[in-house]
């Protein structure tokens, strides 16, 4: 009978809850995980679901701006913008299409200006420089 009494004392433990009221806990009826928690912390965890408890507390805000937007009834940009969702490819980037008769057509970088392409303009410049040099040398 002494053995059974020791066994009963070891399986029925009086635990102190957070409200400091005594509560009898039968360790034999607990699951192995609950027994481990009871041995480590000396009390059983609360039975409330953590996710439900967090949802009931209300939304947590990133900063005061999000809080102010929510109080004002305006949407924050958490679901509206889609920055960084997709890596752009040449097929998905809109390109400007220039028609042949468009007045907004930009000149090509490889075409020469009319003043540079005419050989007569270049030769007349050379002649004026040489005349100037000759006149200055004569004086």
UniProtKB/Swiss-Prot annotation:
GO MF annotations, alphabetized: protein phosphatase inhibitor activity; protein serine/threonine phosphatase inhibitor activity
Instruction: List, in alphabetical order, the GO biological process terms annotated in this UniProt record.
Output: intracellular signal transduction; positive regulation of G2/M transition of mitotic cell cycle involved in cellular response to nitrogen starvation; positive regulation of induction of conjugation with cellular fusion; regulation of mitotic cytokinesis, division site positioning
Q: Where is the composition biased (Basic and acidic residues)?
A: 124-139
* Positions of region (Disordered): 83-139
Q: What does this protein do?
A: Plays an essential role in initiation of the G0 program by preventing the degradation of specific nutrient-regulated mRNAs via the 5'-3' mRNA decay pathway.
Q: What is this protein called?
A: mRNA stability protein mug134
What organism does this protein naturally occur in? Schizosaccharomyces pombe (strain 972 / ATCC 24843)
Statement: the UniProt record of this protein carries the keyword Cytoplasm: yes
> Family, per the entry?
Belongs to the endosulfine family.
Q: What is its main location?
A: nucleus
Keywords, ordered alphabetically: Cytoplasm, Nucleus
GO (cellular component) term, any one: cytoplasm
Do you know which PANTHER family this protein is assigned to?
ENDOSULFINE (PTHR10358), ENDOSULFINE, ISOFORM A (PTHR10358:SF6)
The cellular location(s) given in this protein's UniProt record come to:
Nucleus; Cytoplasm
Q: Which Pfam families match?
A: Endosulfine (PF04667)
Gene induction: Expressed during meiosis.
UniProt keyword annotation of Nucleus present? yes
